[in-house]
Amino acid sequence: MGIVVFGAVFVDIKGFPDDIYIPDGRNVGHVEYIHGGVSRNVVEDIANIELRPTFVSIVDDSALGQDVVRKLNNHKVNTDYVLTIPGGMGTWLAVFDHSGNLAGSISQRPNLMPILDLLEEKGDEIFANADSVIVEVDMDRDIIKKVVALSKKHNKKLFGVVSNMSIAVERRDFLQNFDCFICNQLEAGMFFMEDYADRTPEELCEILAKRVTLGKIPAMIVTMGDHGAVYADLTGDKGICPPQKVRVKD
């Protein structure tokens, strides 16, 4: 079954102005509808490097939901555990300014609790065949508890990613059960209630090493955009991964 990824599917609705963006005025531009969601993006990226992952999620019972599943299947993602339920997908509405920077956004989260029912019914089947597991840590608490329990039962590595850090900070107690937690520089600042915006990779690496020790978090990776990423774990291992050239799409 390969890597199993748990999380929400979002539809990203993005607005781009044709001219200078006026926050309190009308702006002419264009709107794009994009399949999104952190876990959906992650599972597609994993599939793109030929690792044949499995996705556990929910989509709407609509043409758009069918299109999400069709695209994932085209990328060789196993969607056998993607449920089809009315209102199953979330929505992210975002407006960008004339420089391409995010000017504002609103997120509507889906109801993911049907995944808990799926885990009660087929959890052992899913985890027994998994190589490792990735889950959005800001999913419903009961779902995270079940994922953690099944990971321990079947001795599977558990990795956490984040969609909404405001919710994820309430899951601190769970992170000690994860093999690794991955977030970006801004999210790390929110998580540890500090400002890391101007920190260099060298500085953040040292800070992260201290923070994972104090928080008893087994390991963390913090991405830093064009500065690469830093990592640290409870064994004292830490370091910096330099950036690689990529084509930025979004």
Roles of regions detected by a PLM:
Residues 125-126, 173-174, 213:
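Structural alpha-helical scaffold elements that stabilize or flank donor/cofactor-binding regions
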Residues 1-58, 63-70, 74, 92, ...:
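Glycine-rich phosphate/adenosyl-contacting loop at the front of the ribokinase-like
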Residues 132-206, 227-229:
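Conserved beta-alpha-beta core of the PfkB/ribokinase-like small-molecule kinase fold
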Residues 3-4, 27, 199-250:
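Conserved phosphate-binding/catalytic region of the ribokinase-like
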Residues 84, 94-132, 137:
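Conserved phosphate-binding/catalytic loop of the ribokinase/pfkB sugar-kinase fold
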Residues 71-86:
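A glycine-rich helix N-cap at a beta->alpha junction
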Residues 91-95, 104, 228-232:
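Short beta-strand scaffold segments in enzyme catalytic cores
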